[in-house]
A protein has these predicted regions:
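Conserved thiamine diphosphate
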Residues: 2-6, 88, 137-193
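Cofactor-binding active-site loop characterized by glycine-rich and histidine/acidic residues
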Residues: 2-121, 134, 139-141, 150-154
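Short catalytic-loop micro-motif centered on adjacent basic/acidic residues
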Residues: 18, 94-95, 171-176, 198
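Conserved active-site and cofactor/substrate-binding residues in soluble primary-metabolism enzymes
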Residues: 22-26, 36, 70-74, 107, ...
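Generic beta-strand/beta-sheet core signal
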Residues: 42-44, 175, 200-202
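Short gly/pro/ser/thr-enriched loop/turn and capping motifs at secondary-structure boundaries
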Residues: 48-49, 126-131, 206-208
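Short hydrophobic alpha-helical runs that function as membrane-insertion/retention elements
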Residues: 120-123, 173, 200
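Flexible, low-complexity linker and terminal segments
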Residues: 205-291
């Protein structure tokens, strides 16, 4: 994938209510750069809803439609159809968290994907219900400590990318704010495609992950370089393409930098490494590249 020059215009304003060092806030800024001014965003309850601000105030320079947890993709589908009926060329994008995507909103998202609604759905995955106090979601990885899994989560993270790929939507991709050219480029690419598009953005959470407020981007890069969060695209549910070749550093470098994994034993870390390696080899087979 080519390197993109970041657009100069900003559509996310200062003065919003995010935590210092919030990767979601930076991710939203980059996504809005890729969307541009001819866009409307649909936001369910989440950290993003808090950042967007209470009506009539807004931290975004594009129209914002705040909806219920369960209805993000459904509301966006209606808006997209309305703009099409009016003959207006507007990108309708969903900006949601993992709780509103992997869990509460998955029924509406699956329905929209099955109908191939003309929406761009962006999930900011901070791997827990962070806006309500760091409870586990189905996006929380195995072993991660949350307020509802104080000994570490006992089940695996849901594979939302494979779920979306199984719908055979035109475009799905992973991204993270640690590589802004990759993220903005994928948003721009998705914006030019018709039908349901999905981008999953890893978004380290400062309080939830137990990291200093100047480390969220470092953690995002460690996730990519350790292959815990590979950057890739899936087109039509079949064509897998890596967009960055990771360094392949030990996953321990990523895990040990977070308090939510401080309780893990060396055996636990080795088990996670084995799972990361297994998933990486599976991805490599699908891309047809050499590991």
């Amino acid at each position: 994938m080519k390197t993109y020059a970041l657009p100069e215009s900003d559509y996310f304003l200062s003065g919003h209510a995010s935590c210092p060092g919030c990767a979601v806030a930076l991710g939203v800024r980059f996504v809005l750069k890729g969307l541009g001014p001819k866009s409307v965003v649909v936001v369910p309850p989440s950290c993003i809803a808090v950042m967007a601000g209470p009506m009539p105030l807004s931290s975004m320079r594009v129209p914002v439609f705040q909806t219920a947890f369960e209805t993000t993709a459904a509301a966006a589908s209606g808006l997209a159809r309305a703009y099409k009926a009016l003959g207006e060329d507007v990108t309708v994008a969903c900006l949601a968290g993992d709780g509103g995507t992997y869990d509460i909103g998955i029924q509406a998202l699956s329905g929209a994907a099955e109908r191939n609604e003309d929406i761009l759905y962006v999930c900011f995955d901070n791997e827990a219900y962070q806006n309500t106090g760091n409870q586990k979601s189905s996006a929380t990885p195995w072993g991660a400590r949350t307020t509802s899994t104080p000994r570490g989560k006992a089940t695996r993270k849901k594979d939302i990318m494979e779920i979306m790929a199984a719908h055979r939507i035109p475009y799905a991709a992973t991204a993270c704010p640690g590589y802004p050219d990759d993220l903005v480029g994928k948003v721009e690419k998705a914006r030019a495609i018709r039908g349901t598009r999905f981008i999953n953005v890893l978004s380290p959470c400062v309080p939830g992950w137990g990291i200093p407020d100047d480390r969220s981007l470092r953690l995002a890069r460690l996730a990519v370089e350790s292959r815990a969060w590979p950057l890739y695209e899936v087109e039509e549910g079949l064509r897998y393409t890596l967009t960055r070749e990771p360094a392949g550093i030990p996953v321990a470098e990523y895990l040990r930098a977070q308090q939510r994994y401080a309780h893990l034993t060396d055996a636990d870390v080795a088990e996670i490494q084995a799972e990361v390696d297994r998933r990486w080899q599976q991805l490599i087979r699908r891309t047809g590249e050499q590991s």
